[in-house]
Swiss-Prot record:
Biased composition (Low complexity): 1-19, 133-157
Biased composition (Basic and acidic residues): 115-126
Protein name: Putative HTLV-1-related endogenous sequence
Lineage: Eukaryota, Metazoa, Chordata, Craniata, Vertebrata
Species, as recorded: Homo sapiens (Human)
Domain of life: Eukaryota
Region described as Disordered: spans on this chain: 1-184
Gene: HRES1
Length: 223
């Protein structure tokens, strides 16, 4: 019995090649035929332009019907701590102002959400103007009476002012909110100038030069 690593014994006379297709070599055996698609991850890699998009439409799970009522939460979810139902979660979440705005506004426009677009009818139809009694009608349009219920909402205005106090008129969303077309345009160089690689290199060189200059006067400063 020969060693496992020893070559097979040579035959004296050349043997004929076996008829039929050659058995696949080891490198070929693991390569699937070209018709079988390669198994790649289905997600898109942001830095790789060749990476595929999401899975094709017919492979996705079906989307739930948006008109269907929301699915009930299973009670198993509430075995963990802390457990909060959806309305509790909504009440506890810090940015949620729906319940802080008070009950839905009365018809007529004095309530806490009077002019609010989110409070209109289910078909988003605007509310009818309030029917004023005949005594409340102004006798003379030229004399400036006290105005009716204000359409300006001071809370929302204050919120908007507070928001733009931090962003300023150079912010591109400022123009969108205030309706001026080209007002809040931030120049690209101004925005990206201090973060791009060229500036980083330049700052690094400046810092290095400062260190060299500081090292030059070191022996005179510390005798």
């Amino acid at each position: 019995m020969r060693c496992a690593h020893a070559p097979a014994p040579r035959t004296r006379y050349p043997t004929r090649a076996p008829s039929g297709p050659r058995p696949p070599s080891r490198s070929q055996a693991q390569t699937p035929p070209r018709s079988v698609p390669r198994l790649r991850p289905r997600h898109r890699h942001p830095q790789d332009p060749r990476s595929p998009g999401p899975a094709p439409r017919h492979r996705r799970p079906p989307r739930p019907d948006p008109r269907a009522p929301p699915a009930r939460a299973s009670y198993r979810r509430f075995r963990t701590w802390p457990s909060a139902t959806s309305w509790e979660r909504r009440r506890l979440s810090p940015g949620h102002r729906a319940l802080a705005r008070g009950p839905p506004a009365r018809l007529g426009g004095e309530g806490p959400g009077a002019g609010d677009r989110r409070r209109e009818g289910p078909d988003r139809s605007p509310r009818q103007p309030p029917v004023l009694p005949a005594a409340a009608a102004q006798p003379d349009s030229s004399s400036a009476q006290a105005p009716g219920p204000s359409t300006l909402r001071p809370a929302a205005t204050a919120r908007r002012k507070r928001r733009w106090a931090t962003r300023g008129p150079a912010h591109p969303a400022f123009a969108r909110a205030h309706g001026e077309a080209g007002a809040g345009r931030v120049r690209t160089s101004a925005r990206a100038g201090s973060t791009c690689a060229g500036w980083a290199l330049w700052r690094c060189a400046l810092r290095w030069a400062e260190r060299q200059v500081g090292a030059l006067g070191a022996e005179s400063r510390f005798p």
